[in-house]
Amino acid sequence: MAAGLRKRGQPASVGQPAGIWKQWLQRAWQERYLLLREPRYTLLVASCLCIAEVGITFWVIHRVAYTEIDWKAYMAQVEGFINGTYDYTQLQGDTGPLVYPAGFLYIFTGLFYATDRGTDIPMAQNIFAVLYLVTLVLVFLIYHQTSKVPPFVFFFMCCASYRVHSIFVLRLFNDPVAMALLFLSINLFLAQCWSWGCCCFSLAVSVKMNVLLFAPGLLFLLLTQFGFRGALPKLAICAALQVVLGLPFLLENPIGYLSRSFDLGRQFLFQWTVNWRFLPETIFLHRAFHLALLAAHLSLLLLFALCRWHRTGESILALLKDPSKRKVPPQALTPNQIVSILFTSNFIGICFSRSLHYQFYVWYFHTLPYLLWAMPARWLTHLLRLLVLGLIELSWNTYPSTSFSSAALHLCHAVVLLQLWLSPESFPKSIQPSRKTH
């Protein structure tokens, strides 16, 4: 009987290892699928990508030639500041006058000394490589907290963009510095450290003014969270930091400093435009065109604020009240509300910019995966989203820009805007109780 039992059990024992291996392989394949699709794996995928980016970034530095564009001009402007020139109208570089706020000078003064008065280009590239990796970490922390974007998208946000690697480590522009500080401020907002976040936001503005495109969204969030009176101290922090940083130059020539560093009417050269190549140059330079873009920008911001960001049922003027005195009980801002409003505010500004130059790509590159994937839309499949992302990348990599590349960029922007407009409400009815903020 025992022999019979062993005989009858033998086929099962022989087939058992094969069955185990089959189950293990099936589970491994399933987990790999989930690894790329489930946002809960963001940190794991992000860690692997950051490790890969260390090699890729330093490979780019050593294999691709550095291109001088603005670095020498930055260093010349910094040297003038170090030599005691505090009149902004007298600070010049090879490419023209200094047009950035004071924070730029202080940060690049540190780079001036770290790179042997700006002459050690490899050292500067290594510093910007570290800045690139830090920026990635800050961005991944944002995506981890929102838990909306499938991790497979991050491959396209990291390794696939030659233009972004070039902006950071082959061109050494100041735009990456401003954006790194901006992403740090968003992480602070997500941690409910609103005062420190506003301080860091203002510091980012002091490096380059493009960060102000996030300001309408930030103002809306501050009013939502604190009301008018509660938001005033946060806004005062932003203003005070600008005054402190610019004080040496304001004392020397206040009009010169303000007109140079915060010149909102500065004219752009048509030869560098990425987004308006299909227009005649006369229209591109015309003041009426600029005013029309500004009107469209402000109108769309107002529409989003009224119809998409503010959906509590109260008048938008209720945001001016103390949160405890509103009809709708005060609610904590969720990570997705904070990020979606800030990213959307910036994206609307990008869409209606008077001109986008190649280095401006970093103004919104790292926000595109969120804008495309975080807002559910049945009509926009993963494949279509990747197509939009790819066309945007192609448009920014077309040099010089063409009428087709500019038109394709606007078409992609329109698709993203449409998805944002059709997305579900940013402020759902059921939100966790408000937490203590500071």
Curated annotation (Swiss-Prot):
The modification Phosphoserine is found at residue 13. Pathway: Protein modification; protein glycosylation. Pfam families: ALG3. Keywords: Endoplasmic reticulum, Glycosyltransferase, Membrane, Phosphoprotein, Transferase, Transmembrane, Transmembrane helix. GO terms for molecular function: dol-P-Man:Man(5)GlcNAc(2)-PP-Dol alpha-1,3-mannosyltransferase activity. InterPro entries: Glycosyltransferase_ALG3. Its EC number is 2.4.1.258. GO terms for biological process: dolichol-linked oligosaccharide biosynthetic process; protein N-linked glycosylation. Dol-P-Man:Man(5)GlcNAc(2)-PP-Dol alpha-1,3-mannosyltransferase that operates in the biosynthetic pathway of dolichol-linked oligosaccharides, the glycan precursors employed in protein asparagine (N)-glycosylation. The assembly of dolichol-linked oligosaccharides begins on the cytosolic side of the endoplasmic reticulum membrane and finishes in its lumen. The sequential addition of sugars to dolichol pyrophosphate produces dolichol-linked oligosaccharides containing fourteen sugars, including two GlcNAcs, nine mannoses and three glucoses. This is Dol-P-Man:Man(5)GlcNAc(2)-PP-Dol alpha-1,3-mannosyltransferase. It comes from Mus musculus (Mouse). The lineage of its organism: Eukaryota, Metazoa, Chordata, Craniata, Vertebrata.
